[in-house]
Amino acid sequence: MRLPLLLASLLIAGSSLLALADDSATRIGAAADGDWRSDAPGVRRKLTAQDMPAPGATRSAANPSWVVARPEGAWPKAPAGFAVSLFASGLDQPRVVRVAPNGDAFVAESAAGRVTVFTAADGAAKAADKSVFADGLRRPFGIAFSPPGADPHYIYVAETDRVVRFPYRAGDKRAAGPAEVVVAALPAGAGHWTRDLAFSAGGRTLFVSVGSASNAADAMPGAPPEGVAAFAAKHALGAAWGAEENRADVLAFDPDGGGMKVFATGLRNCSGLAIQPQTAALWCVVNERDSLGDDLPPDYATSVKPGAFYGWPWFYIGGHEDPRLAGRRADLAASVTVPDVLIQAHSAPLGVTFYDGAQFPADYRGDAFVALHGSWNRAKRTGYKVVRLIFKNGAPTGEYEDFLTGFVADDASVWGRPVDVAVAHDGALLVTDDAGGAVWRVAYTGR
């Protein structure tokens, strides 16, 4: 009888060890808050609202990174079985990258005011050539093809203060005509200047993200001229006023630019938009506010629900009130939508895409990739990497995993800053890097 008991004990002990190993595989709560030294492909993290510290638990840090030339031998690090190549270099602030149905990659070079198109055969580690598709643009950022699908007729480009479109046929390397203004006036001026674009799955709605004019409604009056109640009765749930009116929002338009509606509010800087193929839901990644401490509040990725209010400026991550605006909109506390995936504070997520390719291992399909531009308001540097959001049956688990790291040179300097991600025609992943003026390509080789 002793042998079966011994075997049972060993099985129980083994199961306990396996459970412990599984628990340690994902860094949860405070353990998920590290710095660049703890980053490595495969490291998983999960944050919840219950993990957040109190406002001011640490001093607000001013810790910007110095951008340096890529050191000799430095290269992005990907998981085992993946190979990283320099797809394109010598770009001027490459930001958003979007891939046309024929495989051409369109990149917004925001500082240069142009959109550049790169061509490459499937499987090619490097772009074969590049052409300027359109120039003379006002800080272009978002790019979208319309109608969605195999045969788009237009390329839409979001400038900082308007949306334009160009006629397009597959293979065009230069716009066939001048820019046609679709949305003549987006909220612009101070604060976040990037504007991203996405079309609904059926192509009937054009979504435009507009970031806030300030960190936490710094210049917004305490109340609108007509009073809060009267203003709220005529505007979307959680709408801001003054210099922040129609900012920190996702706006919705008809494809021709008419029919403007506020789709969702309280998204401080929804810098990247994407449609989830499995559910047709709109997703965005959000840079949350600064100056509340090293680990507060988390940035996030979330599905964007019509009519939802995500908290800014009065609240963050549900009904957690910003102490700088205490009591100003207590009526909204129970109406805040909690985002789906929390990301370490100050990581600065800028771009998001869902993996619908066939090149990566099967468990990647349906997951999302997010480009983290990197922190400045944190004593210990974080971000500066690409992470993978884990989904199960189309729903986020709340976990995310380091996928592409290695862009930090040391405590003071970085040589790369990921901005956006896109799935190439052959299933590889393209990553823009505005610090290095580059586009990186990550391919699965199995070796």
Give the location of each predicted region:
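Blade-loop segments of beta-propeller domains
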Residues: R114-P148
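Asp-box/WD-like beta-propeller blade repeats and closely related beta-sheet repeat scaffolds
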Residues: R139-P140, D161-S200, V228, A232-H235
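Structural WD40 beta-propeller signal
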Residues: G90, A100, S146-P148, S200, ...
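Hydrophobic beta-strand segments that make up the repeating blades of beta-propeller
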Residues: A105-V107, H153-V157, T205-V208, L282-C284, ...
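Beta-propeller domain segments
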Residues: A25-P79, P152, T194, S212-K261, ...
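Hydrophobic core register within WD40 beta-propeller blades
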Residues: V97, I143, L197, C270-L273, ...
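Surface loop/turn motifs at the tips and blade-to-blade linkers of beta-strand repeat domains
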Residues: L86-L91, V132-G136, V182-G189, V262-G266, ...
